[in-house]
């Protein structure tokens, strides 16, 4: 696992063949008092199968950086690439797990995951899609809670559903935006251990901020 704190961004060499490449990226927001620079000349490379954790204080630009990898926002200058191609919009090759779970409250845990699988793989048979959902709920230890709705689940269980949903469409990069921030210390530690185990077993490429 590779850990970077924000002051180290600029010291990371530019690499054109990286799985994820962030090349000389800057982000500037206009304000009433003039331009506000959030990121300035950031260089970062992530190789396939790496778990990279970006650590920094609140407001330092961590979420902005991951939003550019996710495709939710574009850099003011520089470029973000995945497998050599510029990232210009969100896509199923990059799945985000947010702090606030982002589950549909009227659907069960199973259906929340199934919705993602069905959207990304509409041509797969229903049996295949159901099997994918079962596999990924089992991966996070929720096979016995598949029938429950988010309101019936603990915070840790909701985040497990979010992780299962993200992994179920087999993204190239799993993006974690402070996914454990709303959890108690014990649950946070358990989920961190589970996530590292899943990463090791399935050779995922993960970017996480905290």
Locations of the language-model features?
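The feature captures the beta-strand-to-loop junction immediately N-terminal to the Walker
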Residues: 55-57
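Helix-to-loop junction immediately C-terminal to a conserved catalytic motif
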Residues: 70
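Conserved ABC transporter NBD signature motif
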Residues: 78-90
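Short helical segment in ABC ATPase nucleotide-binding domains corresponding to the A-loop/adjacent helical element
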Residues: 110-118, 130
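Conserved ABC ATPase "signature" region
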Residues: 125-145, 197
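Conserved signature/switch motifs of ABC ATPase nucleotide-binding domains
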Residues: 148-151, 169
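Catalytic Walker B motif of ABC-type/P-loop ATPase nucleotide-binding domains
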Residues: 174-177
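Helical segment within the ABC ATPase nucleotide-binding domain
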Residues: 188-202
